[in-house]
Amino acid sequence: MPKETVILAYSGGLDTSCVLKWLLDKQYEVICVLADVGQKEDFTAAEKKALKIGAKKVIVADVKQSFVEDYIWPAVQMGLVYEERYLLGTSLARPCISVALMEVAREYGAKYLAHGATGKGNDQVRFELCAYALKPDLKIIAPWRDVEFCCQFQGRQDLIAYAQQHGIEVSAKPATPWSTDANILHISYESGILEDPNTVAPENLYEMTVDPLTRAPRDPVHLVIQFDRGLPSSVEDLPGGRVYTKPLEMLDFLNKLGGSYGIGRIDIVENRFVGLKSRGVYETPGGTILFAAHQDLEVFALDREVLRTKQVLRDRMADYVYNGFWFSPEAIYARKCIELAEQRVSGKVTVELAPGYCRAIARKAAKDVGALYNEQLVSMDVHGGYVPQDAGGFIAINAVRIREHVRAFGAYDVPTKKN
């Protein structure tokens, strides 16, 4: 009887290497897929490792360009931020990786997908919801939810012992007391010593950014970022005079420059979809710069009520992405609505980078879209187009409900300072 084929989302690390061997012991034929989303990884070494363990095939899927153009750029366009601070670096990578996994599953006729996501985290939800949206007939193998697997592997030491027993290479490099997840948009750090929310993250944890207080340049630097319908279209390095127009190059440049100024660090406690609170430390230098520039241009370009409606949809969409619903009907609907609003968000923003922060300092709308900002109309030195006397009636109408509240319940009791 032929063996069933399993597609394993493989990283080359200890966990998924042990999962690979465990699946082989269960008489599955395993095809490993390593997704290159811009992390610093020795893919050749990981491929050799998986083949040595017994994988039938190892596929390295270079999805960096798709990740930037199809996921990160739309996230910038939509202004996605989860719980007001997290720019969704890990969440956005999961649907991108899932597409690569499903393409391999179709090519090889696999009926099973396996992953190494823990039973307490969000990634199990993200990978599996994406898989069911893209290939509904797929069956999931989640070892960290398997009773037998969890009894066999109580923790990292059990995994190390199992690896040594089966000749699986274990890194000689001491493990950091936290876990990381990296891609071209960000690096996240969690678990280990970071599980105590009162523990300050050590400085040697950070990989993408320098300490803004001690190692960042003192003098600010300026950039001009161009947007076309809400999507980043170019970045001009004013000091260097170079213009970047390719998405991968733009983000790479912003990551390096923003990282050199210590921009994009956050340390937060967030609400996982599975109901737990978790502490995460994140570095997102380039994404932080793009978010700030886009937000400034958006407020400049959009009608006030359109902007407020868009912000409601943005917050819902951020939840959808964080929770794993990128391919859901509600997410597709929200994105289409936001894209319609963003048709007016074209122009350029001048951004200043300084130690630990960035800010927009100038903006200009593209000529072909026009601008709601009317310099003549808003000027205190130019008359016409706006009748100041009309403001009296506007104020009187808005005061009606306040006066009625006072009539019914009495005047507001304003506290006074005691001598």
Curated annotation (Swiss-Prot):
ATP binds at residues 9-17, 35, 114-122. Gene3D superfamilies: Argininosuccinate synthetase, chain A, domain 2, HUPs. L-aspartate binds at residues 118, 122-123. Pfam families: Arginosuc_syn_C (PF20979), Arginosuc_synth (PF00764). One of its GO terms (molecular function) is ATP binding. L-citrulline binds at residues 86, 91, 122, 126, 179, 188, 270, 282. The keyword Amino-acid biosynthesis applies. GO terms for cellular component: cytoplasm. It catalyses: L-citrulline + L-aspartate + ATP = 2-(N(omega)-L-arginino)succinate + AMP + diphosphate + H(+). Belongs to the argininosuccinate synthase family. Type 1 subfamily. This is Argininosuccinate synthase. It comes from Drosophila melanogaster (Fruit fly). The gene is Ass.
